[in-house]
């Protein structure tokens, strides 16, 4: 596509990694996902994690009840894996389309992961079942150990956990989520796209770790996996700009109340739903790779999940769009990524 492109029409995208939270936060943030995306994979790490079919059905009903009339989408539910997860529960949930995937959180890796897995070998029967039935395993890929530098956790995870896992279960479908490193890009590109893929967030494509400390600590840029060196950001950008089928859209939008982002122990997570799609467009434009935007946003994900590609389209136009400054949650607020900033692209109204 020419650098002078003023309008882009693509198949309506899906977001393959979304945190909606619950209750009042859910009610206020949900429309921003619905505005841009047809389907969304919903993360299960609530305060009370989604560990069963019954919990998933109840949470999905709360999501559907909260949806904005004009911004509806299909929530795709996931199961939070624990040492108590039953293979039969997973198989039943997957067969009945209650779950589209199961999520592996290493213990202590991120928000609400205290009941996550300490050793992946502890859930071998679950993984055997998932490989057998073709159920995707979604992975937060960080090796959690106080002796491992936080900037090295993702690379160490590939070496110590992911590579042995794939050798043991070669036909287990795996999504390495929100990748942040050159090592992840290289490892994934060298493996079968039918069994290993990755999602990439807009903030890891746009920022490096210097941004988190520019002019002082920037709590709203603190996320996990943490922002990395610029060489890693450039590896991510190169991966998507080449049209590689291994990579697809997963925003990892993660809302937290302002007071919880700026307190003594600030929460990890970036709420980017109001700007995520437009941010991806910005990156693809900068990389002169707009011809690959549709495959990354709308095609690679459903192909990996063996789901139909959406029939609807969305039109993006070269028109300034100001990102909302804040979202009110009772007496509290949530501040979105790129709050108050102006992006060069907008969604064309019907």
Swiss-Prot record:
- Keyword Metal-binding in the entry? The reply is yes
Could you name the Gene Ontology cellular component terms for this entry? cytosol
Free-text remark on how the cofactor is bound: Binds 2 Zn(2+) ions per subunit.
Q: Which pathway does UniProt place it in?
A: Pyrimidine metabolism; UMP biosynthesis via de novo pathway; (S)-dihydroorotate from bicarbonate: step 3/3
- Residues reported to bind Zn(2+) 1: 17, 19, 103, 252
Per its record, the protein catalyses:
(S)-dihydroorotate + H2O = N-carbamoyl-L-aspartate + H(+)
Q: Which residues bind substrate?
A: 19-21, 45, 140, 224, 256, 268
Similarity remark: Belongs to the metallo-dependent hydrolases superfamily. DHOase family. Class II DHOase subfamily.
Q: Which domain of life is it from?
A: Bacteria
Q: Matching Gene3D superfamilies, A to Z? A: Metal-dependent hydrolases
Which residues are annotated as active site? Answer: 252
Cofactors demanded by this protein: Zn(2+)
Q: Could you say which residues bind Zn(2+) 2 here?
A: 103, 140, 178
Enumerate the InterPro entries for this protein.
Amidohydro-rel, DHOdimr, Dihydroorotase_CS, Metal_Hydrolase
According to UniProt, the name of this protein is Dihydroorotase
According to the UniProt record, list the residues that bear N6-carboxylysine. Answer: 103
Q: Does the keyword Hydrolase apply?
A: yes
Q: What is this enzyme's EC?
A: 3.5.2.3
Q: What does this protein do?
A: Catalyzes the reversible cyclization of carbamoyl aspartate to dihydroorotate.
Q: Which Pfam families match?
A: Amidohydro_1
């Amino acid at each position: 596509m020419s650098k002078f492109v003023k309008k882009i029409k693509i198949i309506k995208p899906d977001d393959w990694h979304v945190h909606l939270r619950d209750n009042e936060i859910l009610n206020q943030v949900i429309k921003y996902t619905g505005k841009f995306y047809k389907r969304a994979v919903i993360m299960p790490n609530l305060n009370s994690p989604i560990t069963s079919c019954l919990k998933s059905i109840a949470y999905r009903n709360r999501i559907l009840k909260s949806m904005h009339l004009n911004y509806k989408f299909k929530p795709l539910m996931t199961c939070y894996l624990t040492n108590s997860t039953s293979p039969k529960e997973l198989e039943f949930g997957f067969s009945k389309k209650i779950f589209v995937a199961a999520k592996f959180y290493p213990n202590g890796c991120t928000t609400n992961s205290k009941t996550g897995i300490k050793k992946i070998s502890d859930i071998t029967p679950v993984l055997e079942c998932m490989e057998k039935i073709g159920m995707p395993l979604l992975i937060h890929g960080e090796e959690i150990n106080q002796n491992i530098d936080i900037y090295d956790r993702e690379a160490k995870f590939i070496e110590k956990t992911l590579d042995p896992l794939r050798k043991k279960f070669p036909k287990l479908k795996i999504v390495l989520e929100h990748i942040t490193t050159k090592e992840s890009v290289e490892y994934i590109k060298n493996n079968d796209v039918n069994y290993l893929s990755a999602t990439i967030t807009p903030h890891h494509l746009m920022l490096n770790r210097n941004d988190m400390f520019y002019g002082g600590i920037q709590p709203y840029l603190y996320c996990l996996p943490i922002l990395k060196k610029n060489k890693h950001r450039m590896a991510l950008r190169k991966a998507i700009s080449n049209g590689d089928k291994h990579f697809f859209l997963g925003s990892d939008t993660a809302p937290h109340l302002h007071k919880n982002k700026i307190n003594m122990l600030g929460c990890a997570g970036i709420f980017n739903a109001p700007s995520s799609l437009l941010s991806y467009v910005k990156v693809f434009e900068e990389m002169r790779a707009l011809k690959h935007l549709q495959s990354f946003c709308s095609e690679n994900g459903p192909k990996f999940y063996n789901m139909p590609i959406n029939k609807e389209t969305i039109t993006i136009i070269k028109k300034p769009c100001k990102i909302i400054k804040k979202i009110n949650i009772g007496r509290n607020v949530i501040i979105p990524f790129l709050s108050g900033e102006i992006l060069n692209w907008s969604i064309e109204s019907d």
